[in-house]
Amino acid sequence: DKPTLIIVDSHIGYGAPNKQDTSAAHGEPLGAEEIRLTKRNLGWPEDAKFLVPDGVREHFEQGVGAHGREEREAWMAKFDEYKSEYPELADQMLKMQRRELPEGWDKDLKPFPPDAKGMGGREASGKVLNAIAPNVPWLIGGAADLAPSTKTRLTFEGAGDFLAGSYGGRNFHFGVREHAMGSIMNGLSLSKVRPYGAGFFIFSDYGRPAIRLAAIMEIPVIYIFTHDSIGVGEDGPTHQPIEHLAALRAIPHLIVFRPADANEVVEAWRVIMQLHHQPVALILSRQALPTLDRAKYAPADGVAKGAYALADASDGKPEVLLLASGSEVSLCVDAYEQLKSEGIKARVVSMPSWELFEQQSQDYRDSVRPPGITARVSVEQASTFGWARFTGLEGERIGMKTFGASAPLKELQKKFGFTVDGIVAAARRQLRRE
């Protein structure tokens, strides 16, 4: 009923007469002569290569190996009894082990109505999470002491807390330790549980080694990072992520989502739950974002392809492309409407996931971002690093080139150029360049 901690007092380079207990045994090969002397020291044949002594082989085959087989057979017998007595629960467990989703897992996902005031990405995600989790019993998680702020607490009846002596709850209290949280989630995922863990985006660096290992192991861990930009406002540059999006996007095999409104959050979660061999980072705003009118603009299910044309020229032949993710998409939509009123044909491309977009066919990518249209502006309240591959070197990239500042969001957006007028001016400059 308790974890087992195994402590092995060891000697690095054990048996090597000249290198045991030295850094040389750690950072470089022993060398042919030291290997020969080590074998002599251990009483092994000096010339044999890749030798496994008979006693060692017997210990593993007849000792450890036999014990493992006996334990597995006993466990399988117990599981057969469990399956007979609780067939539905056993079926759920087998589905979990196969990384399958229960039928109807997304039946409670509903679209959000258009709303100019909208809601924060974190708030929308909390609602979606609580719509999915009751239908996926092995979806469990928590936050690094920030559940109320990240909106990641499961609040439906029976969710409960995972505590010492009470292991049925589904809310984990990881404490203020992002790296430990990420490591715990990796362990849970390797047992086929579907874990999520949340924190402020600025603190993602603390968990980065665990995130990287999840990507190496190809396990579907879900990281929820909120307070995603200078939108944090008065908390200032220590809490305003700048380089963090670029850093996560640089990790191979990690899928990064930064949705633009509540309905993109819904569709991001729909995709996330169906990714069974990749970790995902879901990047969410603190501030409210307008919930776009999907009768007027493109459906949010374009999220599944990583990027899509959200608003377009009436003839489908834009003169300039406005590319953005997350909270800046609605700014681009407003700029699009202003350009439209001036007779300038623009297209707004919402790019919630670069990784998914780059997995699409070349035809699809070209249909969203036509190669012949070189007047391009990207907008993201973060480092512009990486955007050049979508804008081209001649395109304009509106982003953060310094750390942030402590002020209300509107003042910060004006200071750093994240305004409708600034985007419109950039679009005009691009068209003049043409």
Model regions and ranges:
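Thiamine diphosphate
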Residues: 1-53, 57-283, 287-290, 361, 368, ...
